[in-house]
């Protein structure tokens, strides 16, 4: 992987920094693993905005990714590494010995031709998927399940990983990149190694239009709006909000806890904000 700074042929190109991955597949994705992707533009079933700053963007197909990795004992060969517009990580196309093909999140350092396998008896090697009970303590893993058989939910973005700290009875303790330590059942599966495309965070898209291509709309400050649009709006000239920062719907935005599901709190050993 390499970072390339683009020649400043225009104001929009001046700040562009690209991440170039040699060996990335240049053809089309596998049609059998594509699904149509409808854009919600941040609206709910009533057409009301529930997530701001979303809308537009280039039309995309969704790549069906195998997050369960439940095809045990059958070796698979990495056919190619592909770009995925729906996520920051790259995808690896696996061809199993029985002929089935599946996409997975490409681990760091994986190459075309590598042999991978899933299951309890899989060797300890980057890219192989095993239950947490079979992974050595201290290992770095990614694509971790939170419930057995549900599919990976933790550490799926580019460059992310989780460390297996300990195993106590039916649960394993994981340290997340945020600093949070949480318990996960030992039957949950995880993939050894880190997610690939680790230099993704070093790129610079360079201009506002590149955000619009990605379906991201502008973020407008509340203090420059009218009172009908935002609690911070109104006033003559440049004025402060006049209150503690809130969302357009009046919810405090700094330090206010909005998490309501208390049933899963017992799985969190150490919170990410703990000192």
UniProtKB/Swiss-Prot annotation:
Function of the molecule: One of the primary rRNA binding proteins. Required for association of the 30S and 50S subunits to form the 70S ribosome, for tRNA binding and peptide bond formation. It has been suggested to have peptidyltransferase activity; this is somewhat controversial. Makes several contacts with the 16S rRNA in the 70S ribosome.
GO cellular component, one term: large ribosomal subunit
Keyword Ribosomal protein in record: yes
Pfam name, any one: Ribosomal_L2_C
Lineage: Bacteria, Pseudomonadati, Pseudomonadota, Betaproteobacteria, Nitrosomonadales
InterPro entries: NA-bd_OB-fold, Rib_uL2_dom2, Ribosomal_uL2, Ribosomal_uL2_bac/org-type, Ribosomal_uL2_C, Ribosomal_uL2_CS, Ribosomal_uL2_dom3, Ribosomal_uL2_RNA-bd_dom
Region feature (Disordered): 36-55, 223-275
One GO term (biological process): cytoplasmic translation
Domain of life assignment: Bacteria
Organism: Thiobacillus denitrificans (strain ATCC 25259 / T1)
Swiss-Prot/TrEMBL keywords: Ribonucleoprotein, Ribosomal protein, RNA-binding, rRNA-binding
Subunit composition and interactions: Part of the 50S ribosomal subunit. Forms a bridge to the 30S subunit in the 70S ribosome.
Protein name: Large ribosomal subunit protein uL2
